[in-house]
From Swiss-Prot:
Record function comment: Involved in the final reduction of the elongation cycle of fatty acid synthesis (FAS II). Catalyzes the reduction of a carbon-carbon double bond in an enoyl moiety that is covalently linked to an acyl carrier protein (ACP).
Family membership noted in the UniProt record: Belongs to the TER reductase family.
Annotated GO biological process: fatty acid biosynthetic process
UniProt-listed HAMAP family: FabV_reductase
Positions with a binding annotation for substrate: Y225
Pathway noted in the entry: Lipid metabolism; fatty acid biosynthesis
Positions contributing to NAD(+) binding: 48-53, 74-75, 111-112, 139-140, 244, 274-276
Enzyme class: oxidoreductase
Catalyzed reaction equations: a 2,3-saturated acyl-[ACP] + NAD(+) = a (2E)-enoyl-[ACP] + NADH + H(+)
Protein name: Enoyl-[acyl-carrier-protein] reductase [NADH]
SUBUNIT field: Monomer.
Listed EC numbers: 1.3.1.9
Molecular function, one GO term: enoyl-[acyl-carrier-protein] reductase (NADH) activity
Amino acid sequence: MIIKPRIRGFICVTAHPAGCKANVEKQIEYVTAQGAITSGPKKVLVIGASTGYGLAARISAAFGCNADTLGVFFERAGEENKPATAGWYNSAAFEELATAKGLYANSINGDAYSDAVKQKTIETIRQDLGQVDLVVYSLAAPRRTHPKTGEVFNSTLKPIGKPLTTRGLNTDKETITDVSLEPASAEEIEGTVAVMGGEDWQMWIDALLEAGVLAEGAKTTAFTYLGEKITHDIYWNGSIGEAKKDLDKRVLTIRDTLAAHGNGDARVSVLKAVVTQASSAIPVMPLYLSLLFKVMKEKGTHEGCIEQVYGLFKDSLYNAAPIVDETGRLRADYKELQPEVQDEVSALWPTVTNENLNQLTDFVGYKKEFMHLFGFGLEGVDYDADVNPDVKIKNLVQM
């Protein structure tokens, strides 16, 4: 079939296999050009491995550290006349390219929150890798079924304490709008923490440790975002922020557990705002990112997922002098938070109108990166060609 982009709200409901492969290849080329991280991990588990920061971590591990990788994700396969999700095509491309390099690259497709997927992951590590020395936790999901109680929790993006009206960008209509959000209820906050907090990360590490498949001295990291004033009401001070604060609490227990296991370590890693399927759903983010791109590109400091994560591996995760803050978090977001960047974004924020949107912001760049997530708009791809949407992932365990 000929696959074209079909956008509904903040999501593109189609994805292009050749375009997704080109996007993965582009990220691999970047990592390869940077050179090897000699002290890096050798056997890596990435939970949430198919898109965004999780995919970038898998690429950085394989092509930056020559590591064997096992990826866990929840994606939909393609059919004869229906495209797969972008994450499916990304993972198929990654596996093909990593295998061609002589690396182990297997995947498990299923609900990472479930005990069954944890058990299958443990079996696979035991059988194929023996042990893993790095666990990257990069899940973003709208809901979670608790594996012990069966209770279903939903995650929400809402302010806390009072209603919020803020500027936003309607990406469909390309207009500046006011976005009003009611505050989250106690139940919604609890649900968001249950989905996006640190409990599942802790469950993964406990299960891997108990099964004996975590190498001595193993490291683990989960990703977070702090941001600055513009995003604080909806993000850090909102329902999602409560979940991220839960990560900060739970990492202390995980760190102690791993420290006792051959001097291992656990860190929350703070990454910059980027265009991902998750971030495009956050009301202020498209406008904030469009402004941030403009300012950071002018300063020559713009970075996407792969630049951020490769930098995190090289400068912090596998560096004797990591970039850490006073709470012990690893920081890769410092270029975004430079006062001159934030001051400029804050000054431009209230002045953007429908008329000057493309002059004051890099909305064009935002749209381009958004389309790239789904494999569209990449150079060298023939989008008028007939392609088979049913791409197989060879080394896949389907749960």
